[in-house]
């Protein structure tokens, strides 16, 4: 403000020092030194510029000078006009010209100066410029020290901010200042803004330094977050940091972005830990068994998505087999989770529980499979279907152990049409004494081995025929049904004729056609039958049994027609095949009434035989039974064939036996048990 110093003439004629604050059309706003007078506007003709400071002081006696003095103690000093009367050394005797009465005073050389030759100021003595200040810079522009460099650059006398007009005022005594202001005003405002920002940062740094000094003795924690997780820790627009700062008791949170270090300061350890839980993001992995990966993920990722939602983790990733970043155990697949430490702990609990649950379910499933396997193995013991092929290959050589194992604990004695009870008397006159336990056991062996060796289709057709011939149900000893131990209707069977020779033999011819029709129809229905019921098929009267074969011919196996009985009725193993071709055999050998009459006479002769003959016949019958179940089979009146040959080609063997029996019966007469 010294550059705008002026001298204002007072009422007493002295000039007092003042400062120009503003320039008007015809006056100046002047502020006096030390404010001994209030600020006021002074006309141009009462204001002059001070003399230059480098003027040489050459004062001699009689020169007019100006003395820096005051009239009284209440007024400040001013320049008064005077005249030098005498000088002695450094002291001068002056006489004031302003006063009417002469007033002399002795002064030193420092209080004297030559008379100021400057005239009063005019309108063109000062130049004024104004610059509009933005709102954000008004506060900073109020400080005159901010414009120090600008003032020096433009050559202004004074630069200050006017609060009423919000303008920056530049005052100068040079006209060139106006041009410079127009050039530098924008740059000056921009520099003010930059300096303001820097100053604000410095102030924050100063405050932070003070806070750091205060918090040095308080609670604080420091942790590092990985660079790739820094974005998650900061959050969207710094949401996580703001949330952590809102925790009660948190005083400051610092972040070093270069190293990824967070520093949290708080009033208590609990507040610091809570704020840390919001900011500390980590990555961790959990090993999952490979066989449970699919179940952990779930269909369309439903299970793993539920785990992620409940735990709060940010993301999950399954480590591939080709990736080797994480340590991997044998048979395990790493699941990588990203989130806060609390979220990682939650997902670990959920995943471990789910894996334990899956293992328990798998263990229960394996136990169920073991139980099912044991049940399947136990069930196979009652089903000899798996050994069916081997039994077919064995033929008639099935031993007693095999038969008993197939038969199991089930007893077949006394059941079925072909089974004879202990009190059964054959129609051929054989009483119960002839059927001993050995014969019954042999009969069981033969039936089981023959039945297991028969084909599936033969069993079904045989079962169908049996079911077709049971119109009366399964009552016990019923006359019209198939009861246990009962016959199949005595009027239509050969056994009924043999039992009662005196009856009408022509009644059999009436029922032959219906019997054949029943056999034919039975093969076309009832295909779905039970395996066990098939294995216990009841023997029909047409099926020859061991006991029937022994009692029908006590003397020999040759009937009255000259045919070998053992070859006319081959082994029961080929029973189904024999029935299949029975129509052809019946065409070759039709049944006549004479056959039944001759058979009845033979039966009557057998009843009249002596006891010795019967005993001899009994021994021969036992011998035949042993030969039939032995390794080699001996045919008395027919061609010899092994069991394997019969099993391999039963159809051919049956046909050959029928032909051979016809030839042998016509050429020679066999003798057995002494009876021709």
UniProtKB/Swiss-Prot annotation:
Region (CC2 domain): which ranges? Answer: 353-379
Start and end residues of each Agenet-like domain:
4-50, 63-115
Query: What are the start and end residues of every segment in region (RNA-binding RGG-box)?
Result: 471-486
UniProt xrefs under Gene3D superfamilies: 2.30.30.140, K Homology domain, type 1 (3.30.1370.10)
Q: Name one GO cellular component term.
A: cytoplasm
By its UniProt entry, which InterPro entries does this protein fall under? Agenet-like_dom, FMR1, FMR1-like_C_core, FMRP_KH0, FXR1_C1, FXR_C3, KH_dom, KH_dom_type_1
Specify the superkingdom: Eukaryota
Composition bias, Basic and acidic residues:
609-632
In its UniProt record, a GO molecular function of this protein is:
protein homodimerization activity
- Stretches for region Disordered: 380-676
- Swiss-Prot/TrEMBL keywords: Cytoplasm, Developmental protein, Differentiation, Myogenesis, Repeat, RNA-binding
Q: Where is the composition biased (Polar residues)?
A: 423-439, 645-665
**Domain KH, first and last residues per copy:** 222-251, 285-314
Q: To which protein family does this belong?
A: Belongs to the FMR1 family.
Tell me the function of this protein: mRNA-binding protein that acts as a regulator of mRNAs translation and/or stability, and which is required for various processes, such as neurogenesis and muscle development. Specifically binds to AU-rich elements (AREs) in the 3'-UTR of target mRNAs. Promotes formation of some phase-separated membraneless compartment by undergoing liquid-liquid phase separation upon binding to AREs-containing mRNAs, leading to assemble mRNAs into cytoplasmic ribonucleoprotein granules that concentrate mRNAs with associated regulatory factors.
Q: What is known of its domains?
A: Disordered region at the C-terminus undergoes liquid-liquid phase separation (LLPS) for the formation of a membraneless compartment that stores mRNAs.
Q: What is this protein called?
A: RNA-binding protein fxr1-A
Task: Supply the gene name.
Answer: fxr1-a
């Amino acid at each position: 403000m010294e550059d705008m110093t002026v001298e204002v003439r007072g009422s007493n004629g002295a000039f007092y020092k003042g400062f120009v604050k503003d320039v008007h059309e015809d006056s100046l706003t002047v502020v006096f030194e030390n404010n001994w007078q209030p600020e006021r506007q002074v006309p141009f003709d009462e204001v002059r510029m001070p003399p230059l400071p480098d003027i040489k002081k050459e004062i001699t006696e009689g020169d007019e000078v100006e003395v820096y003095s005051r009239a009284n103690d209440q007024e400040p000093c001013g320049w008064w006009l005077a005249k030098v009367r005498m000088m002695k050394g450094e002291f001068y005797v002056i006489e004031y010209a302003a006063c009417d009465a002469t007033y002399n005073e002795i002064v030193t050389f420092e209080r004297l100066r030559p008379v100021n030759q400057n005239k009063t100021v005019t309108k063109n003595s000062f130049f004024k410029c104004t610059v509009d200040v933005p709102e954000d810079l008004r506060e900073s522009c109020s400080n005159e020290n901010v414009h120090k460099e600008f003032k020096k650059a433009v050559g202004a006398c004074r630069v200050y901010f006017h609060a009423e007009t919000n303008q920056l005022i530049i005052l100068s005594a040079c006209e060139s200042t106006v041009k410079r202001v127009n050039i530098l005003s924008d740059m000056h405002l921009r520099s003010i803004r930059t300096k303001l920002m820097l100053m604000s940062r410095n102030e924050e740094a100063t405050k932070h330094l003070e806070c750091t000094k205060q918090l040095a003795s308080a609670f604080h924690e420091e942790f590092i977050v990985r660079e790739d997780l820094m974005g998650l820790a900061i959050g969207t627009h710094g949401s996580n940091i703001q949330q952590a700062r809102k925790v009660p008791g948190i005083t400051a949170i610092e972040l070093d972005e270069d190293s990824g270090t967070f520093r949290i300061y708080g009033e208590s350890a609990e507040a610091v830990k809570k704020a840390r839980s919001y900011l500390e993001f980590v990555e961790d992995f959990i090993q999952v068994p490979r066989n449970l990966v699919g179940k952990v993920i779930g269909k369309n990722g439903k299970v793993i998505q539920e785990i992620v939602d409940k735990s709060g983790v940010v993301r999950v990733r399954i480590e591939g087999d080709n990736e080797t970043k994480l340590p991997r155990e044998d048979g395990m697949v790493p699941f990588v989770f990203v989130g806060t430490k609390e979220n990682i702990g939650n997902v670990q609990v959920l995943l471990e529980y789910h894996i334990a649950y899956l293992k328990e379910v798998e263990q229960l499933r394996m136990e169920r499979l073991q139980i099912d396997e044991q049940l399947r193995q136990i069930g196979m013991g009652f089903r000899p279907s798996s050994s069916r092929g081997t039994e077919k290959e064995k033929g008639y050589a099935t031993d007693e152990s095999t038969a008993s194992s197939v038969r199991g604990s089930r007893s077949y004695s006394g059941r079925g049409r072909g089974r004879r009870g202990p009190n059964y008397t054959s129609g051929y006159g054989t009483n119960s004494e002839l059927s001993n336990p050995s014969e019954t056991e042999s009969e069981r062996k033969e039936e089981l081995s023959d039945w297991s060796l028969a084909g599936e289709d033969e069993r079904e057709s045989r079962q169908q025929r049996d079911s077709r011939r049971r119109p009366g149900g399964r009552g016990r000893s019923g006359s019209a049904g198939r009861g246990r131990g009962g016959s199949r209707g005595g009027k239509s069977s050969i056994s009924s004729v043999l039992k009662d020779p005196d009856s009408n033999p022509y009644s059999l011819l009436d029922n032959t056609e219906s019997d054949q029709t029943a056999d034919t129809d039975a093969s076309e229905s009832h295909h779905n039958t039970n395996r066990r019921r098939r294995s216990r098929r009841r023997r029909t009267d047409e099926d020859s049994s061991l006991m029937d074969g022994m009692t029908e011919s006590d003397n020999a196996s040759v009937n009255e027609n000259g045919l070998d009985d053992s070859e006319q009725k081959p082994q029961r193993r080929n029973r189904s095949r024999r029935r299949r071709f029975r129509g052809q055999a019946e065409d070759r050998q039709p049944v006549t009434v004479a056959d039944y009459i001759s058979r009845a006479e033979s039966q009557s002769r057998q009843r009249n035989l002596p006891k010795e003959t019967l005993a001899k016949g009994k021994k021969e019958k036992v011998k035949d039974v042993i030969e039939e179940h032995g390794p080699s089979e001996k045919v008395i009146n027919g061609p010899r064939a092994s069991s394997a040959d019969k099993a391999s080609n039963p159809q051919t063997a049956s046909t050959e036996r029928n032909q051979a029996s016809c030839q042998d019966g016509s050429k020679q007469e066999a003798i057995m048990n002494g009876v021709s």
